[in-house]
Amino acid sequence: MSETITGSDQREVIIIGIGEWSTGDTVMTSIGLGSCIGLVIHDETRKIGGLAHVMLPKSSGKPNERAGKYADTAVEVLIKELTQKGSKVSNLKAKLAGGASMFQNFSGNLNIGERNAEALKAILKELSIPIVREDLGGTIGRTVTYYPKENGRLVIRQADGTTREI
């Protein structure tokens, strides 16, 4: 399950591990996104949203307590929880970060990062949830921090020290 810590600026921060998710208005972070993708679904009107650490493109269709692990179930659980908190699907927007190609020197590269990105884009398009910003691909891992109360700001810190905001 996700863990809550107090950040250096004394704000509560929820740490989202692989296959985990959280929704609400608290700052959320996901550390060590390689081929995994940090999926943010944000409701700017209500200043709430969710972050999921998506590892694989598709679930087997079986119920799973780690719904955040798969693109299809992560989108579903974030939308479900946000609408239960009063969001309208028509107000939701998405941001994606991660999907790196971490093992490019191996033959038969599975392109998991690319497949994760394609799956999330297709699902969000089908649900008419626009992707307003993305930072995908490359060969360097990322850590993302999502600030729901700050217009859905998403800060991305790459393993090489580069930081940017989307």
Curated annotation (Swiss-Prot):
In its keyword annotation, does this UniProt entry include Hydrolase?
yes
Query: Which keywords appear in this protein's UniProt record, sorted alphabetically?
Result: Chemotaxis, Hydrolase
* InterPro entries (alphabetical): CheD-like_sf, Chemorcpt_Glu_NH3ase_CheD, Cytotoxic_necrot_fac-like_cat
Q: Listed GO molecular functions?
A: protein-glutamine glutaminase activity
Q: Which reaction does it catalyse?
A: L-glutaminyl-[protein] + H2O = L-glutamyl-[protein] + NH4(+)
Q: Which GO terms describe its biological process?
A: chemotaxis
Q: Which family does it belong to?
A: Belongs to the CheD family.
Q: What is this protein called?
A: Probable chemoreceptor glutamine deamidase CheD
Organism field: Methanospirillum hungatei JF-1 (strain ATCC 27890 / DSM 864 / NBRC 100397 / JF-1)
Entry's EC annotation: 3.5.1.44
HAMAP family linked:
CheD
